[in-house]
Amino acid sequence: MGVVVKRGKHSRGVTARALAAAMALASGFAAVPASAETLTVEGLYPARSPAAAGVGSLVVERFGGRDGRELSFALEGMLAELAIYGQPYFRVVAERSSAPADAILSGIANAAVQNQPVEEDRKVCVERDDNDKCVREENQKIRCQRRIVTFNPSLRMARLDDGAIVYQRQLQERDQIVWCPDRAAARSVEDTVSALIGNAVAEVRLDIAPVYRSDVIRVLEVRKGLDKDQSSRFRDALKATARNPQGACDIWQALDGEVPGQSSVVFNLALCAEQRGDLDEALVRYRQAQTLLPRERAIVAAFDRIGARRAAEADYATREDRLSGSRP
C-alpha cells in the first residue's frame, strides 16, 4: 500500500524550461522518418474550445489548493504572452483591477505525492578468487521506492456579463520515477510538480486559443509512369525539398504538363499549393490525387488540415471583427 507524503510549503515557480518543453510537445512538428523528403506546411488551427477562444479579455483568479497559486501565475503569464500573427490574443486584466473584462478563469489545484515500495533485481558477486575476481554471481532483490506524483487541477472560465460557463476541464497529469540504494532519484518532487504544471498550462493553451502550427509532411516518391529523364528530374525535385522547396514544386509543375495524372506529382503539387496557402488549389489537387490513390491516408490527413485551417481563419476573423467593434 502506498504512503502519501506531505510536501513542504516553500515557494516554487514553474520553470521556463518546463513550460517550453511542454509546449513543444503539445504543438510541435509532426514526426517523419529522418531520411524522408518533406515540405513544411504552416497555418492557423482552431482552439479545442471555440467558446473560450471567443473571449477577448479575462481575469485569472488566484486558484485554490496547495498548488493553485503557482498554476494561476503560470497561466496568467502564458495568456499575457500569447500572440497570434504577432498580436496579443487575450487582454489579461489584473484580478483586483477595476478595468472591464469579458470572463474570469478560476480553479483549484493540488499535487499528490505517493511512495510505494518496489523491488528490483541486481546481480551480486557472492564468490571471489584469490585475485579478488568475481567467479560467481547471483540475482538478488533490492528494495527501492517508486514515487508517483499526480496533478489533477480543475479549471473553469465563465463570462462576467451573464455567468455562462464557456470552458470547464479537469486535467490529469502524472509522473513516476523509481530510486534505489544504488540509484538516486532523477528529479526532486518540486521539479516534478513544476514540470506537471507546465504540462497543464500547455494543455490549457491549446484548449482556449488557436495555434499557429508547422507540420512536416512527407512528399510521395513513387515514379511509376515516368521515363528515365523524367525520373531523374523527379529525383532532383526530391533533393530540392530541403533547400529550395519552390524549385521542387516548379519541377513537379513541369512534369505535370508532360505526364498528367502521375499520382506522386499530383499529390506533391497539392502539397505545394497547401504550403503556399492556396487552399482552394490544394483541395482540387488532393481530390484528383484521391481518385488515383484512394487508400492514401496522407490525403485524408490533408483534407483534415485544410478544413481545420479554414475554420480557424473564419473564427479568428469573426472574433477580430467583433472585438474591433467593441473597442473604443
Indicate where each model-derived feature is located.
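N-terminal secretory signal peptides that target proteins for export/translocation
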Residues: 1-14
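C-terminal/domain-edge helix-coil "capping" segments
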Residues: 35-52, 145-150, 156, 160-261, ...
